[in-house]
Amino acid sequence: MGTPRIQHLLILLVLGASLLTSGLELYCQKGLSMTVEADPANMFNWTTEEVETCDKGALCQETILIIKAGTETAILATKGCIPEGEEAITIVQHSSPPGLIVTSYSNYCEDSFCNDKDSLSQFWEFSETTASTVSTTLHCPTCVALGTCFSAPSLPCPNGTTRCYQGKLEITGGGIESSVEVKGCTAMIGCRLMSGILAVGPMFVREACPHQLLTQPRKTENGATCLPIPVWGLQLLLPLLLPSFIHFS
């Protein structure tokens, strides 16, 4: 008589443990978004109806990378489970106005459906991204696009910018695999649109730029803007300049 009773108790214990484990499962919102918007404050919606059940020890995450050039804004966003990490909210402004602006936000959290941000307003101040005055001397090709820019009009730069930037961001992770081409006005020196930060939440970012001399204009004494000639350009011009130099000497 004792043995069946013990078996019943064991079954109840197993069922209880199973119910307890299922009650501790972590559920996260899941979704991806890659878009370019002219009015992200009103047009971008970060809500999703998909749900993901996480493995043991995982967290929920929501991560977004925002890149603004001129009047266009590229947005790459991901929500879902993350296998490891620490609970934290991280906001980084990689490139500040005036000119090109890059901001990232990531939230790692431990409660079900805690990755529930639905808009950009909580960490992106749209009123601060518009320049009030522009330069009359510095103009730069300006665009941001997923993949490649098919049009990059030369636009007057905001006061406070000193050079033109051109580069490409290769982004992988968090379900995202994409490249973003960026051109525009900036005050930063070199290929540092991401300020040297290579990881944004589960996303890894690789920044690549063409020859930096081609993206660093300077102003002449009369206020005009010119581009330095790279070394290979001088090598091409030298044979043309030598005969004139010999003739006048």
From Swiss-Prot:
Gene Ontology CC terms: acrosomal membrane; acrosomal vesicle; extracellular region; plasma membrane; plasma membrane raft; side of membrane
Primary gene name: TEX101
Lipid tethering residues (GPI-anchor amidated asparagine): 222
CDD domains the UniProt entry points to: TFP_LU_ECD_TEX101_rpt1, TFP_LU_ECD_TEX101_rpt2
Organism of derivation: Homo sapiens
Residue positions assigned to the propeptide: 223-249
The protein, known as: Testis-expressed protein 101
Signal peptide: 1-25
SUPFAM superfamilies according to UniProt: Snake toxin-like (SSF57302)
PTM summary: N-glycosylated; by high mannose and/or biantennary complex and/or certain types of hybrid oligosaccharides; possesses different oligosaccharides chains according to its subcellular localization in the testis.
Subcellular locations according to the entry: Cell membrane; Membrane raft; Cytoplasmic vesicle, Secretory vesicle, Acrosome; Secreted
